[in-house]
Amino acid sequence: MANSTTTAVIAAANGNGTAIEVIASPLTRAEYVRRGRILGENTERLGAEQAGFLVSSQSHFEMAGGEFCGNASRAAAVMFSKLRGADNVEFTVSGFKGLVSATVDRRSDNEYYVRCRFLGMSVGVYPVEGHEQTINIVDLGGIVHVVVESRFPAQAEIYRETHHHLTEELSLRERDAVGVVWIERKDDSVAIHPVVWVRSIDTFFYESSCGSGTIAACAVTGVSDIIQPTGKIIRAEVDGDFVTLESDMEVIHD
């Protein structure tokens, strides 16, 4: 059966679009990287900050870089829901060994509220000593985040250099994906500024929203409702046995 070329871009909490190409059968890892780079480049102007492939024959979603992505997982849930005509869907994703259970609530033609449950997701939190700021490594397996509690340095050259320095210092260069997530506490709320590098496709984005970064911030602070750079909320729950992630989603191109 030939691979299709159905493509959509789906945003999470008004940002961080995921470009998804629906294919019938899996690719090699090298092909995921090659085609994923092209897909990402072709859809960046449409709001995509990452790209992946929905393998319809295997109920699987694979990121171009093989990493785990929380926003892309919920974007994939929207696509699986549309393809199956079902509100509740289960599937697997790259960077996570368990099963994703998703509930997709359609609000309008292009708008949805999506909740994903990742049963068995391991969330390791490891304090980093020797810095003025409070820093924790949060390891989700398919992506690792360095959570820095300080004001976000808005200048691109500064946050790029900080990301590079922490990635080297903490020996994270060989991980599939590395995020540095600045968190700012405002009264009882927490806002994040996520900067994410994906090794195999060498992409680097100050993401306009970040699902896995939300999980990391929740794990460190205990706060569930995390304010994204868009000003919108993504909600996370980190339990000993599972992680949940939920927010508004919107199909911005198909």
Task: Please report, for each region that a protein language model flagged, where it lies by residue.
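A glycine-rich beta-to-alpha transition motif near the start of alpha/beta enzyme domains, typified by
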Residues: M1-Y113, S122-G130, V146-D254
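Internal, conserved structured core segments that host functional sites
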Residues: C116-F118
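Short, cationic low-complexity segments
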Residues: E132-V144
